[in-house]
């Protein structure tokens, strides 16, 4: 007969019961229940270290407690004199089939249960309702008997109560017949007593509650599709449990080798089917448990090949349902699906070497097998569907341990590594990496606008009212400044930054007004806000805008090459009539000696000049009372009197109080205020609809800072154009200095205009019709054409 050990349970507290297992090898001795078991696992304390020990019946210094129903070996280590030196508090989970074995008659069980319940009490800190508190007595080679106090728990984890000051509270789970044989502990190094035994010094085996159902025959494999009666998840109506297993390589000196984190009811991101949830769990979502462990590289035993373990190994098991194969397929996409999964402890101990997981001490090892006949097909279909859905999102998730110790699902930025709580925050953050976003086919070369439609790009260019440059496509990444071509968008973006640094304080000037800015984007905004409505006629070739159709028609001749205007004296042709007139005046002035004194038009003979002069005389019907001015109509005469002889501005704008001579001018001015927000200067009462004009006002009137300084003389200027003019004084050219003010220039004609227009009160050039004086002849001619056009044609 095989030697056996006795498990003595002294029922000193009420509300505890124990069902013995075996073939006639159980009896009740007073208040003691004697149970004979074939195999167990024991945790002892020796020299301050914890060791997992298995005891064989034929070893002189060890005891074997063996399960008679199933041979599942967790670890077998030679036991030496390690039991002396202290007491150990531990939690032992007895196999469920052992505890629920049908032994004895109903009377015997009732007597045993009543006796136990009246003499046992459940500690307050124990979570499991089915608790047996007793004393495990095992013979010791030296002392003869060494007692280990602990708790015997069925089904779930408990929190041990420390019994003595130097007691080490640990948790040992002996796998029952419906759970995987795994041990959970935190930071327990195992002594190496025999070179032939497996060294457990550098890795930790992790406990998994209800990992999967194991058949009564321990040598058989377990399939995901099998449903075992008596499943705890079925009996209590709980949800299936998702167990996520992470195996990491440990850093040198790392003490915390693993742990278990319970996650509350998971969200629907596991992608389980609705029918699966409704039919089995009443619509409840599966719970999740994340188990993580580490493996050190300092392993010397040949059975443990840490090098074969990847830096990060991930495995997932769903307990209690056969649709588990479809769970979390997005986390399994990058790894091949293995048909057989080893328990975590064996995976850590043997890596990919499954040959080592064979009969140890004559017992067979159980492997976890996934039935992929039905689940793999669903996994493939859902993977393809998920991939099609995920092509547009392109966002990955990660799980981190939060400050409170609970796992958090975050969305990391794949560029800079920042982590965000939601996909929306990540999408908003991705705008900070425009060079890494998906590039569209067409993009505007004047701003950052991109589109996939050519029509949309054309409409966008019309809003600019600028000359469109060559449209770049995704394959044609060319720098607009130097023409250099790049293969990647980020390289082009970095190259453009070098141009921006070289440009420095380059100013962008509006071609329609005096606005200037250092940023191209601000200039584009100014063009859209101020000048977009002024140029409704757009050239379809280059996108340039014009105020009138005649200007657009004239401009189109530059694209078609048409030149309809022919010189009568030579073969010169022009697309513009004004260019033809200029040509005749400069090249053929001798051929046209007769010139009109009013409009300066020339003729080839005197007869043509006389006919032309009659036109000027017939139009002089309206005489000005203040001067000799004559007009062809009353409205023209009225405009003359108001503009020349009236300094008062009777028509005032109610918004900005600007005055005008005529109501039409006021009406046109007020139209500019409609629909525009007025911007008030915070330093004075100045306000205007154009924010850029307000900025220029503040810079020129209220700002004492001079940002633009000359590098030679350190003189400051408010605008860069002023600095450019000043730099001409250092070019070595002759400088014309005004004797009345600080104005100076290298341009002689500009200096002359300055003196005449600013410092001269004399108006030497008088109008022939109204005697109005002008400083320059050009001003006089412009006045004549504007106010005496009819008279000049006579």
From Swiss-Prot:
A zinc finger (C2H2-type) spans 411-433, 442-464, 477-499, 508-531, 537-559, 565-588, 594-616, 622-645, 651-673, 679-702, 708-730, 736-759, 765-788. One of its GO terms (molecular function) is RNA polymerase II cis-regulatory region sequence-specific DNA binding. The keyword Zinc applies. A motif (Nuclear localization signal) lies at residues 380-389. GO terms for biological process: regulation of hemopoiesis; regulation of transcription by RNA polymerase II. It comes from the Eukaryota. Belongs to the krueppel C2H2-type zinc-finger protein family. ZFX/ZFY subfamily. This is Zinc finger Y-chromosomal protein 1. It comes from Xenopus laevis. The gene is zfy1.
């Amino acid at each position: 007969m095989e030697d056996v050990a006795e498990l003595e349970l002294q029922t000193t507290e009420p509300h505890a019961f124990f069902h013995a297992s075996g073939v006639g090898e159980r009896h009740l001795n007073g208040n003691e229940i004697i149970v004979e078991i074939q195999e167990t696992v024991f945790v002892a304390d020796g020299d301050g270290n914890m060791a997992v020990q298995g005891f064989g019946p034929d070893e002189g210094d060890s005891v074997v407690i063996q399960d008679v129903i199933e041979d599942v070996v967790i670890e077998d280590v030679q036991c030496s004199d390690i039991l002396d030196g202290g007491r150990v508090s531990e939690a032992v989970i007895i196999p469920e089939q052992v505890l629920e074995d049908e032994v004895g008659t109903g009377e015997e069980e009732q007597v045993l249960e009543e006796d136990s319940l009246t003499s046992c009490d459940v500690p307050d800190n124990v979570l499991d309702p089915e608790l047996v508190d007793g004393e495990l007595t095992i013979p010791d080679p030296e002392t003869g008997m060494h007692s280990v106090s602990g708790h015997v728990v069925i089904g779930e984890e408990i929190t041990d109560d420390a019994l003595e000051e130097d007691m080490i509270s640990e948790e040992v789970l002996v796998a029952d017949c419906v759970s995987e044989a795994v041990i959970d502990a935190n930071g327990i190094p195992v002594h190496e007593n025999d070179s032939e035994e497996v060294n457990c010094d550098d890795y930790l085996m992790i406990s998994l509650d209800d990992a999967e159902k194991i058949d009564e025959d321990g040598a058989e494999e377990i399939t995901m599709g099998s449903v075992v009666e008596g499943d705890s998840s079925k009996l209590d109506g709980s949800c299936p449990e998702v167990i996520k297993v992470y195996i990491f390589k440990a850093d040198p000196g790392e003490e915390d080798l693993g742990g278990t984190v319970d996650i509350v009811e998971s969200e629907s991101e596991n992608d389980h089917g609705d029918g699966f949830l409704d039919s089995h769990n009443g619509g409840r979502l599966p719970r999740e448990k994340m188990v993580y462990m580490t493996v050190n590289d300092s392993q010397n035993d040949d059975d443990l090949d840490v090098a074969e373990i990847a830096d990060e190994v991930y495995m997932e098991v769903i307990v209690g349902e056969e649709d588990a194969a479809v769970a979390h397929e997005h986390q399994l996409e990058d790894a091949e699906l293995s048909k057989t999964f080893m328990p975590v402890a064996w995976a850590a101990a043997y890596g990919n070497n499954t040959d080592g997981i064979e009969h140890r001490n004559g017992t067979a090892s159980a492997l976890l097998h996934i039935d992929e006949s039905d689940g793999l097909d669903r996994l493939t279909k859902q993977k393809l569907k998920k991939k099609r859905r995920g092509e547009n999102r392109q966002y990955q998730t990660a799980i981190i341990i939060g400050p409170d110790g609970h796992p958090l699902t975050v969305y990391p930025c794949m560029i800079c590594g920042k982590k965000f709580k939601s996909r929306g925050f990540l999408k908003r953050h991705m705008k900070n990496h425009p060079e890494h976003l998906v590039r569209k086919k067409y993009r505007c070369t004047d701003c950052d606008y991109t589109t996939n439609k050519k029509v949309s790009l054309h409409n966008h260019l019309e809003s600019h009212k600028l000359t469109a440059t060559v449209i770049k496509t995704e394959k044609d990444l060319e720098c607009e400044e130097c023409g250099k071509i790049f293969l990647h968008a980020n390289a082009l973006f970095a190259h453009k930054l070098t141009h921006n640094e070289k440009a420095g304080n380059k100013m962008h000037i509006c071609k329609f007004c005096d606005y200037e800015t250092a940023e191209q984007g601000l200039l584009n905004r100014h063009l859209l806000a101020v000048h977009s409505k002024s140029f409704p006629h757009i050239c379809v070739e280059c996108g340039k805008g014009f105020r009138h159709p005649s200007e657009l028609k004239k401009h189109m001749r530059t694209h078609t090459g048409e030149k309809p205007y022919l010189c009568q004296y030579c073969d010169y042709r022009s697309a513009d009539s004004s260019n033809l007139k200029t040509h005749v005046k400069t090249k053929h002035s001798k051929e046209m000696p007769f010139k009109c004194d009013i409009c300066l038009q020339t003729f080839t003979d005197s007869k043509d000049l006389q006919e032309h002069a009659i036109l000027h005389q017939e139009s002089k019907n309206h005489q000005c009372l203040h001067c000799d001015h004559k007009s062809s109509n009353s409205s023209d005469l009225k405009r003359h009197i108001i503009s020349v002889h009236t300094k008062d501005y009777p028509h005032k704008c109610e918004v900005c109080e600007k005055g005008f001579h005529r109501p039409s001018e006021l009406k046109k001015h007020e139209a500019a205020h409609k629909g525009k927000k007025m911007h008030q200067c915070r330093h004075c009462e100045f306000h205007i609809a154009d924010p850029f004009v307000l900025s220029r006002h503040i810079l020129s009137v209220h700002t004492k800072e001079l940002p633009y300084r000359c590098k030679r003389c350190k003189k400051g200027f408010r605008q860069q154009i002023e600095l450019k003019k000043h730099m001409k004084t250092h070019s070595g050219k002759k400088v014309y200095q005004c004797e009345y003010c600080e104005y100076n220039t290298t341009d002689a004609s500009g200096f002359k205009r300055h003196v005449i227009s600013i410092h001269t009160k004399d108006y030497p050039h008088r109008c022939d019709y109204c005697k109005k004086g002008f400083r320059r002849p050009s001003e006089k001619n412009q006045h004549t054409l504007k106010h005496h056009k009819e008279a000049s044609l006579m």
